[in-house]
């Protein structure tokens, strides 16, 4: 078989391994290829490797539990790793892998498959899961009558397509003849309890199907290697860092408050790569908590139980409970507690609930929808009603090659006004209000799907309006440290040039030094007709298409709801106009770029 024809479907290699092999061999001459061929043949025929290549018996295969995860953040991976550890402790052989590293040709050999998968954007599969998701939906997918499976779906009920990817996997596996060990488990953002219960239930369901032995060795289990590379500080055990700077970087006349935040990681040993995110735990605003307590007529010092702790109600609302983000279940529960005709009517319409959630907080429910006389909502019932506080993720705006033990963020203060009452985002207000020396609990959330090219000579195109420019500041710091000679192109947009040009002097310095090849900006409200980044992209379509033909990697960061979609449509239009592609071929072209890691998005 010619190497150019090689694919993961025609070999025992995964698609990422195929791409690495193609990249390596493309750089070798005939003599070098011959030497590598001999080396690989000798390695493969070594006694130890021959033993590893021996076929697995049916009995051995039947005793292996394959656990696959697909998640845009680390939540799915964490759940899968914890399940793998519990399964190994019970004597099961475990194959733990990311869906992105899994060879789909192996699927028809599986007998026990446990999936943990999140949903990204509007019902889309996360990057890790795309290839497996597509394979199962294709005509190439095999019948799976020998397979038992279970799916844990992660999602956010405030979005329309809640847990859609998990639903897709469950439906497709069933259609292919696989047998469900358990009904599909759908988890909201407060997934910990449901995931823990699934661990227990699925291992109980697996037990009658396989034999265990105390001496079983886990096969292809990468969880130990993963754990070794991770810091001791995690989402569950964050590092108490110090805020060094929280500086407004929009002008006095701007209607947006955007902060440049610098945080000292000190002696934590926390490391990050450009493209990663920082998880930030925060406390709710005390004024907001006092307003809620007064509105409900509850005493701040009333003792409540949260988990295994007995704390005051006020402390629970400050530190443990989500107050600034509503979710459908809470709106529906409050409709029943208040018996409000408006809320009751609204709660039956998913789209109306979604719109309501976007513009209201829990304090608005308390203020505007009074509880009915027999609601009987005491302090403990209140904390049970509210879901746990969750950290917020911010794209990191710095490279450790330049800032060492610091980490920088670009934070837009989320603020709104409802019936004359100011409302702020929980984490953004916490960071915007933080004074020098304040403590903030943080952890690094890796994002391997938003990485610079391995070769610093590769051109990059960066599209980041608003705070979406944050990771590209990190990209530029890293490329300067690398001495990268590849061209770089930034598209940036915001309302006004004078008020909202984030990091303007830094971009100008990069241009002057030749580190940034070009920048195109769109300031939407500086002229009568609004101009956005997608318009600039279309204007530069011929040049941008040429960059892509020359191997450029394309990155988008920022708003998923509108910007990323509009930019994608602009890119498709360029492929049609300047590449001569049909609409279908243009979609396929960018899908190919994505699968080759040349089209990456960090959208939210």
Curated annotation (Swiss-Prot):
Q: Which residue intervals define the domain FAD-binding FR-type in the entry?
A: 236-453
Signal peptide residues on this chain, from the entry's feature table: none
- E.C. number(s) listed in UniProt: 1.8.1.2
- What Gene Ontology molecular function terms does this protein carry? flavin adenine dinucleotide binding; FMN binding; sulfite reductase (NADPH) activity
Q: Could you say which protein family the record assigns here?
A: Belongs to the NADPH-dependent sulphite reductase flavoprotein subunit CysJ family. In the N-terminal section; belongs to the flavodoxin family.
Could you list the residue ranges forming a coiled coil in this record? Answer: none
Gene that this sequence comes from: cysJ
Q: Where does NADP(+) bind?
A: 524-525, 530-534, 566
In this chain, FAD is annotated as bound at: 324, 358, 392-395, 410-412, 425-428, 604
The role this protein plays is:
Component of the sulfite reductase complex that catalyzes the 6-electron reduction of sulfite to sulfide. This is one of several activities required for the biosynthesis of L-cysteine from sulfate. The flavoprotein component catalyzes the electron flow from NADPH -> FAD -> FMN to the hemoprotein component.
Q: Binding positions for FMN?
A: 71-76, 118-121, 154-163
- Cofactor(s) listed: FAD; FMN
Relate the assembly described in the record.
Alpha(8)-beta(8). The alpha component is a flavoprotein, the beta component is a hemoprotein.
Flavodoxin-like domain: residues covered? 65-203
The organism named in the record is Shewanella sp. (strain MR-7)
Q: Which reaction does it catalyse?
A: hydrogen sulfide + 3 NADP(+) + 3 H2O = sulfite + 3 NADPH + 4 H(+)
Per its UniProt entry, what is the enzyme's top EC class, as one word?
oxidoreductase
Mention one GO biological process in which this protein takes part, according to its record: hydrogen sulfide biosynthetic process
Q: Which cysteines are joined by disulfide bonds?
A: none
What is the name attached to this protein's record?
Sulfite reductase [NADPH] flavoprotein alpha-component
Classification via Pfam families: FAD_binding_1 (PF00667), Flavodoxin_1 (PF00258), NAD_binding_1 (PF00175)
The pathway entry for this protein reads as:
Sulfur metabolism; hydrogen sulfide biosynthesis; hydrogen sulfide from sulfite (NADPH route): step 1/1
Q: Which GO terms describe its cellular component?
A: cytosol
Relay the cofactor remark from the entry.
Binds 1 FAD per subunit.
């Amino acid at each position: 078989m010619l190497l150019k024809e090689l694919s993961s479907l025609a070999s025992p290699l995964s698609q990422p391994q195929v791409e690495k092999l193609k990249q390596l061999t493309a750089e070798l001459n005939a003599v070098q290829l011959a030497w590598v061929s001999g080396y690989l043949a000798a390695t493969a025929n070594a006694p130890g490797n021959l033993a590893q290549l021996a076929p697995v018996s049916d009995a051995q295969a039947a005793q292996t539990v394959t656990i696959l995860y697909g998640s845009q953040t680390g939540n799915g991976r964490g759940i899968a790793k914890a399940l793998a550890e519990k399964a190994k402790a019970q004597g099961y052989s475990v194959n733990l892998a990311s869906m992105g590293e899994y060879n789909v040709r192996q699927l028809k050999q599986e007998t026990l498959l446990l999936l943990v998968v999140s949903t990204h954007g509007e019902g889309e599969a996360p990057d890790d899961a795309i290839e497996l998701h597509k394979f199962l939906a294709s005509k190439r997918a095999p019948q799976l009558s020998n397979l038992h499976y279970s799916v844990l779906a992660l999602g956010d009920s405030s979005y329309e397509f809640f847990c859609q990817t998990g639903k897709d996997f469950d439906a497709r596996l069933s259609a292919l003849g696989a047998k469900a060990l358990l009904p599909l488990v759908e988890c909201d953002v407060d997934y910990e309890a449901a995931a823990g219960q699934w661990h227990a239930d699925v291992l109980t369901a697996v037990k009658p199907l396989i034999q265990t032995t105390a001496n079983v060795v886990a096969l292809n289990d990468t969880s130990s290697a993963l754990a070794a590379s991770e810091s001791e500080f995690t989402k569950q055990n964050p590092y108490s860092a110090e805020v060094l700077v929280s500086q407004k970087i929009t002008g006095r006349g701007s209607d947006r408050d955007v902060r440049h935040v610098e945080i000292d990681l000190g002696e934590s040993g926390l490391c990050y790569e450009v493209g990663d995110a920082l998880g930030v735990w925060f406390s709710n605003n005390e004024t907001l908590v006092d307003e809620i307590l007064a509105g409900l007529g509850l005493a701040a010092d009333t003792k409540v139980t949260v988990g295994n702790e007995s704390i005051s109600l006020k402390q629970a609302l400050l530190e443990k409970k989500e107050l600034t983000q509503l979710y459908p279940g809470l709106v529906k529960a409050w409709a029943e507690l208040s018996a409000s005709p408006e809320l009751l009517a609204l709660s039956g319409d998913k789209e109306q609930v979604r719109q309501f959630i976007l513009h209201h907080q829990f304090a608005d429910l308390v203020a505007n929808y009074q509880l009915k006389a027999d609601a009987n909502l005491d302090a403990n019932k209140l904390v049970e009603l509210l879901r746990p506080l969750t950290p917020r993720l911010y794209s990191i705006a710095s490279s450790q090659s330049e800032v060492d033990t610091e980490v920088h963020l670009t934070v837009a203060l989320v603020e709104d006004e409802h019936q004359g009452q100011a409302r702020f985002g929980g984490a953004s207000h916490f960071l915007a209000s933080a004074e020098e020396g304040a403590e903030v609990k943080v952890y690094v959330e890796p994002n391997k799907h938003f990485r610079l090219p391995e070769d610093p000579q590769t051109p990059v195109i960066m599209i980041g309006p608003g705070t979406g420019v944050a990771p590209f500041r990190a990209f530029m710091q890293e490329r300067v440290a690398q001495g990268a000679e590849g061209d770089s192109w930034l598209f940036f947009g915001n309302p006004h040039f004078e008020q909202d040009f984030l990091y303007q002097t830094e971009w100008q310095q990069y241009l002057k030094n030749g580190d940034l090849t070009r920048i195109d900006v769109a300031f939407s409200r500086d002229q009568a007709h609004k101009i956005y980044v997608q318009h600039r992209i279309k204007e530069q379509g011929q040049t941008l298409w040429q960059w892509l033909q020359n191997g450029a990697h394309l990155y988008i960061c920022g708003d998923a709801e509108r910007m990323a979609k509009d930019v994608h449509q602009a890119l498709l239009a360029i492929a049609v106009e300047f590449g001569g592609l049909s609409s279908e071929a243009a979609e396929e072209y960018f899908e190919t770029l994505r699968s080759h890691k040349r089209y990456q998005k960090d959208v939210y």
